[in-house]
Amino acid sequence: WVDYNSNGYVAGPSLINIEESHNFFNPKAGLTYKLNNFNNLYFSYSKGNKEPNRSDYENGSPLPEELDDFELGWRLKSKKINFNSNLFYMNYKNQLVLTGELDDVGSPIRTNSGDSYRLGIELEKNWDLFDFLKWNSNISLSKNINKSFYFQRNGSLINLGDTNISYSPSTIFSSRIIYNRGNSSIIFSNKYVGEQYMGNIDSETSKLDGYNTSDLLINYQLFENSDIFKLDFKFHIFNLFNKLYSSNGYFYTYDLNDSLSGQVNTIEGVGYYPQAGRHFMAGVTLEF
């Protein structure tokens, strides 16, 4: 049970008056089947309800979102390798999705999308190749869809059909190779994020290109066996290959009225948050 009340002025200034009550029931259930000492299968179902936040109420009249989450997985655990696979289907009603727009204080605006779903698979692997070398990686492949999404374009409300949910790349991959020898370690990490849309209308203007970045961390420790103090040196190279990319941004639309023809034209705009090129961080830690 959630009781949400707020009364007062917000930026503008404008008066906000919220009086909302929600009664939620969020059951969860699952089964695990042990195949042998190394493998098990599992299935789970959960019901989730979530109320809008204050910013959502300030920017509209939102409804709480409702989720039915189904998951099916396999786990492998052995001496050298751990592997997890997870199939998921998340069916939403009134999911609160980002529109791509920002409010007057720069906070992202969300809206209810009606019916939507997320369907995909997650794979995770932790592999001890040797005593001194490990390789950890994970990948997520998904389809994230708004069903029959409506949008006001050029003065008319149109059904765009199925569209991609904003800020939901279909592919995310990360990998870490960890080398440990004595009192030194080297970690090479890589991350790939596929292309995504910053809005829910599948506009090419709102598309954010995929990117692939790598980091390198070098660590060296002195006096590691000392009972008095330890000295730790770290050198971190971010964006090792100096990739130029934007990891986020915003997308907005507005209507422009032609005073001569009386026609309404929907204009699209976009902004990006470019990330830093190759950069470094060094540190020394003295531990007593």
What are the residue ranges of the model-derived segments?
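Signature of Gram-negative outer-membrane beta-barrel scaffolds
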Residues: 1-36, 136, 151
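Transmembrane beta-strands of outer-membrane beta-barrel pores
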Residues: 1-5, 45-51, 78, 87-93, ...
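Gram-negative outer-membrane beta-barrel transporters
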Residues: 4, 89, 111-201
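Outer-membrane beta-barrel translocator domains and adjoining extracellular loop/strand segments
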Residues: 5-13, 52-60, 95-104, 142, ...
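Conserved C-terminal beta-signal and adjacent last beta-strands/turns
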Residues: 32, 43, 68-72, 130, ...
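Membrane-embedded beta-barrel scaffold of Gram-negative outer-membrane proteins
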Residues: 34, 40-44, 64-150
